């Protein structure tokens, strides 16, 4: 290996570290919130059942509607991401799913729950594959598997954080006259909205649009 080749290789590694620290922590937090929001209905189900008389069959059908909408909208969502750009579209996904998740606090029966679960699936569709597509814009193929593996740390982190957090929020039962499950949906939905707005300032569609140095050959 020549000195010039070694210098280029070191520059590439340094750039990859800069890219990783710039975008991965933010995307990991976004995905962590997505997983927590996706599972909060299970945590809320006992209190919701007491208040609304919802059976296990109702919750099962509501969950199936979430995944039906998710798969139905996933491909169109990713096509839209290519048209509008990753920054705007990931922001749109997060803001809409945060609003829908928070809005689930106001369901009054099985049919309104069905509607909200369907809307949540449609709103969240495209986020995970969209992030993977976004990473391909920034990372040469040699680095993608490692970076995706780091990104996936959000899954065990969400499982570790989500249950205790949801338990604490359910403990707000009676605060300001609202049930714990109301607070669970509202307070776990708000971070997605805030992170969605932050996407507009934190993310950049492609390396050539970055305002910070990205000097490697993709």
Residues of each region from the PLM?
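Extracytoplasmic
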Residues: 22-56
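Residue-level signature of mid-helix packing/kink "hotspots" within the transmembrane helices
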Residues: 39, 67-75, 159-160
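Conserved MFS/SLC helix-loop-helix module at the cytosolic interface between two early adjacent transmembrane helices
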Residues: 73-108
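Paired small-residue
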Residues: 100, 111-119
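Cytoplasmic helix-loop-helix junction between adjacent transmembrane helices
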Residues: 119-153
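Glycine-rich segments within core transmembrane alpha-helices of 12-TM secondary carriers
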Residues: 148-167
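Symmetry-related core transmembrane helices of the 12-TM Major Facilitator Superfamily/SLC fold
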Residues: 183-201
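Conserved small/polar residues in nucleotide/adenosyl-binding loops
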Residues: 217-218
């Amino acid at each position: 290996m020549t000195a010039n080749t070694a210098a280029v290789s070191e520059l590439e590694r340094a750039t990859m570290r800069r890219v990783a620290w710039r975008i991965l922590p933010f995307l990991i937090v976004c995905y962590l919130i997505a997983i927590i929001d996706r599972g909060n209905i299970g945590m809320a189900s006992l209190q919701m059942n007491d208040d609304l008389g919802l059976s296990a069959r109702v919750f099962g059908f509501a969950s199936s509607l979430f995944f039906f909408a998710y798969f139905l909208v996933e491909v169109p969502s990713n096509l839209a991401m290519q048209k509008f750009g990753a920054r705007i579209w990931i922001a749109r996904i997060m803001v809409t799913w945060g609003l829908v998740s928070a809005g689930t606090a106001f369901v009054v029966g099985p049919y309104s729950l069905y509607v909200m679960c369907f809307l949540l699936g449609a709103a969240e569709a495209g986020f995970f594959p969209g992030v993977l597509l976004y990473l391909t814009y920034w990372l040469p193929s040699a680095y993608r598997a490692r970076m995706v593996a780091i990104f996936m740390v959000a899954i065990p982190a969400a499982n570790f954080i989500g249950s205790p957090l949801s338990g604490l929020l359910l403990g707000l039962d009676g605060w300001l006259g609202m049930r714990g499950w109301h607070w669970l949906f509202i307070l776990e939905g708000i971070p997605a909205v805030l992170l969605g707005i932050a996407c507009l300032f934190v993310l950049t569609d492609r390396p050539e649009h970055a305002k910070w140095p990205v000097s490697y050959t993709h």
